[in-house]
């Protein structure tokens, strides 16, 4: 193995801790440090957003489904987003749906479970690479046009929005992130980008980066090998993608 590039959120903590041993074996990687990885965790996202000057819906970690019995009296009205600390996000319109989501997420991802205020608006995602010093390289942006039942992008179109780019740059600078990154935001009715999630890897739609003239996996490989990354063209907005699955 020359280079090891993780693709799943749950792989990151293990591989970050193993990075020195991997380097000793001659296996290259391009990974954040433990502090950077922890700083973008879903249960610390609100703190990061405040530090970077980015809006974000309030998020609360919980360990008991009993929270949903009287959450509306605690100023947490439905609908709410119920999320796993590593993965999974489900919209709950009432107590019953919230408790079902809570139990399913605990069974797969463990505790805590996160409850997030639901923001409505236009969903956009940005993928790029942090260089470890605070710079964001090769950003590619897309707007969701169709989603799965879990809210994952099934179809989308490439965009270029300077305000979204600046928002992502502030977040990457605050983290001093190193490696691939996906930033999920919601553009609310006031035109403000609300930070929803930061994922520590490329998204499933990353092939769109090749389609818009910015091959981010190739850039990541070059950086991991210590080579100069390829020159990037300005991204091409208006490129449509549709995901498909074959079993």
Residue ranges and their predicted role:
Residues 1, 68-75:
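Short amphipathic alpha-helix with an adjacent loop that forms part of the alpha/beta core around
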Residues 2-40, 55-58:
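A short, GP-enriched loop/loop-strand-helix hinge that lies immediately N-terminal to
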Residues 14-17, 91-92, 125-127, 207:
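Short glycine-/acidic-enriched loop or helix-start segments at secondary-structure transitions
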Residues 29, 45, 57-61, 112:
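Structured catalytic cores of enzymes that bind and process phosphorylated ligands/cofactors
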Residues 31, 37-43, 91-94, 149-151:
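Short, charged, surface-exposed secondary-structure boundary motifs
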Residues 49, 59, 72-91, 110-121, ...:
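ATP-grasp fold ATP-binding core
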Residues 93-176, 186-194:
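Phosphate-binding site of ATP-dependent enzymes
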Residues 160-247:
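ATP-dependent carboxylate activation and anion-phosphoryl transfer catalytic cores
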């Amino acid at each position: 193995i020359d280079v090891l590039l993780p693709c799943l959120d749950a792989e990151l903590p293990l591989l970050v801790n193993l990075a020195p041993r991997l380097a000793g074996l001659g296996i290259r990687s391009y990974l954040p440090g433990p502090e950077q990885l922890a700083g973008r965790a879903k249960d610390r996202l609100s703190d990061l957003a405040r530090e970077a000057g980015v809006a974000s819906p309030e998020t609360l970690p919980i360990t008991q489904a009993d929270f949903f019995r009287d959450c509306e009296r605690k100023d947490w009205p439905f609908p709410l987003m119920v999320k796993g600390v590593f993965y999974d996000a489900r919209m709950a319109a009432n107590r019953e749906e919230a408790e079902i989501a809570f139990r399913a997420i605990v069974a797969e991802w463990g505790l805590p479970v996160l409850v997030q205020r639901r923001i409505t608006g236009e969903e956009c995602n940005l993928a790029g690479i942090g260089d470890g010093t605070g710079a964001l390289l090769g950003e590619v942006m897309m707007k969701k046009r169709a989603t799965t039942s879990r809210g994952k992008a099934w179809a989308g179109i490439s965009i270029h929005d300077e305000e979204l780019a600046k928002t992502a740059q502030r977040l990457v600078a605050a983290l001093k992130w190193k490696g691939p990154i996906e930033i999920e935001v919601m553009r609310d009715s006031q035109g403000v980008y609300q930070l929803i999630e930061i994922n520590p890897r490329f998204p499933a739609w990353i092939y769109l980066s090749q389609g818009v003239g910015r091959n981010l996996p190739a850039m990541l490989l070059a950086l991991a090998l210590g080579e100069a990354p390829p020159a990037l063209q300005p991204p091409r907005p208006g490129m449509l993608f549709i995901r498909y699955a074959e079993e």
